Amino acid sequence: MQELKGIGASAGIAIAKAYRLEEPDLTVEKKNISDSEAEVSRFDEAIARSKEELEKIKEHALKELGQDKADIFSAHLLVLSDPELLNPVKEKISTDSVNAEFALKETSSMFVTMFESMDNEYMKERAADIRDVTKRVTGHLLGVEIPNPSMISEEVIIVAEDLTPSDTAQLNREFVKGFTTDIGGRTSHSAIMARSLEIPAVVGTKAATGTIQNGVTVIVDGINGDVIIDPSAETVKEYEEKHNAYLAQKAEWAKLVNEPTVSKDGHHVELAANIGTPDDVKGVLENGGEAVGLYRTEFLYMGRDQLPTEDEQFDAYKTVLERMEGKSVVVRTLDIGGDKELPYLQLPKEMNPFLGYRAIRLCLEEQEIFRTQLRALLRASTYGNLKIMFPMIATVNEFKEAKAILLEEKEKLVKAGQAVSDDIEVGMMVEIPSTAVIADQFAKEVDFFSIGTNDLIQYTMAADRMNERVSYLYQPYNPAILRLITLVIEAAHKEGKWVGMCGEMAGDEIAIPILLGLGLDEFSMSATSILPARTQISKLSKQEAESFKEKILSMSTTEEVVAFVKETFK
């Protein structure tokens, strides 16, 4: 019996035989060719066949996983139509008289290396897209079949170096009980897909493929990030009991689907969900979400080759508002730049894009893009309970300017006879430390705050959470972070305004009792975290949590805070 430690990417426990998803031999040799025109035609044919396959995979992903996951394959299809990739391959075939496989390998390797060297998560994901697409096209050129996980017909746990988006989208939930990989993290494509499919997964083990043989029994514990190879009968029994306990826990959570979120001493807080597309609303309602606390509208702009029209945006916003049936929907205006780029929007190359031209800064300069989105939102406002918030606000003047543009567009629509809701709350994200420090000034201008802890933490601690060498400094429970959060909540409440939180911290079991004690009004998280959080809050006393507020805020280290919370609220 052996044990590997990785990252629990999708909760649950699975026990089954290992199925190694072997990488095909796609060794490419350089060959000189005499008929470059015929070779270019061979390349075009491989591209066409790859597009056909991806269209089918995209259709399957849309049906099984929803629009945002299908959009991954829209991005792949864009790569297969991108002249910046295809033209250099064809030029290399013609100029160097080399075979298509070699020309593709050389060109794609150059792009992958370039993208992976960027300090930008979005561009790193594009490198993964190019690798995935290149593998598929190369397979067609070599006549090598690419493994198809949808053909698996017995209960297995997949073992792979990594799973591409194409692999994961083709997993058959009936037979694939879980998977484990050598590489990857919680935010990798495969991890996100696993959570959508509710398949237990452990990624980043570093040694799964080097240790696990085909057919051996494997346990995947996606809750704790453990992989047990060839377990004893006693260990199998132990994990079967853990699996049953997890299912019982899920059943307990399910009882609270239609219940409000109320603490042990009767205090109500709102549990909301973060979404990226209209299809995500289904998960919000199935998990008992009381609101949408963050609608990330940038997904409307990604995976396509041009800006979405006003009508396309209107349809998306209207759909979300209608499906939420009067429950609050907080829409964040376009947050592009930093780790999210648009291929059709020529953003300047910056030394540090996270501190550069992004989000509201871009929108205030590219006003036609901003105004189009605001018009679509205003037109949709009569179909539900819409709230609008601006991201990455750094100064009071930025907020005032953004709100003034919103009011200008509202006035134009009303004059044109368009119905617009009269009670749209307008708020802002708190992601920049300077904003938290003068939250009392912002509180006079806004209707609400939403604290984006992911960025607030990394800006406050000067630590990129994606950089493994400094990730130890990404500390949600650091007293400095907790004091900033307190400044925001106290400033808002003094002005009679409410405060939400839409970063990962909002659904964290260590953070929840702290945030309850600090007075947070709305906790917005992934939909699958809502019921566990509701269960936890129902067992907490707000009065007790408040009584420890000063003690926690007077602590000096993260470790001290965590130890106290674990001991006090165990």
Swiss-Prot record:
Q: Does the keyword Magnesium apply?
A: yes
Q: Which GO terms describe its biological process?
A: N-acetylglucosamine transport; phosphoenolpyruvate-dependent sugar phosphotransferase system
- Which residues are listed as membrane-spanning? none
GO MF annotations, alphabetized:
kinase activity; metal ion binding; phosphoenolpyruvate-protein phosphotransferase activity
What reaction does this enzyme carry out catalytically? Answer: L-histidyl-[protein] + phosphoenolpyruvate = N(pros)-phospho-L-histidyl-[protein] + pyruvate
**What is this enzyme's EC?**
2.7.3.9
Obligatory cofactor(s):
Mg(2+)
* Disulfide feature: none
**Residues annotated as binding Mg(2+):** 431, 455
* Keyword line: Cytoplasm, Kinase, Magnesium, Membrane, Metal-binding, Phosphotransferase system, Sugar transport, Transferase, Transport
| PANTHER family reported for this sequence | PHOSPHOENOLPYRUVATE-PROTEIN PHOSPHOTRANSFERASE
Any additional notes? The reaction takes place in three steps, mediated by a phosphocarrier histidine residue located on the surface of the central domain. The two first partial reactions are catalyzed at an active site located on the N-terminal domain, and the third partial reaction is catalyzed at an active site located on the C-terminal domain. For catalytic turnover, the central domain swivels from the concave surface of the N-terminal domain to that of the C-terminal domain.
Domain remarks in the entry? The N-terminal domain contains the HPr binding site, the central domain the pyrophosphate/phosphate carrier histidine, and the C-terminal domain the pyruvate binding site.
* Name used for this protein in its record: Phosphoenolpyruvate-protein phosphotransferase
Record organism: Bacillus subtilis (strain 168)
What broad taxonomic lineage does this protein's source fall under? Bacteria, Bacillati, Bacillota, Bacilli, Bacillales
Gene name of the encoded protein: ptsI
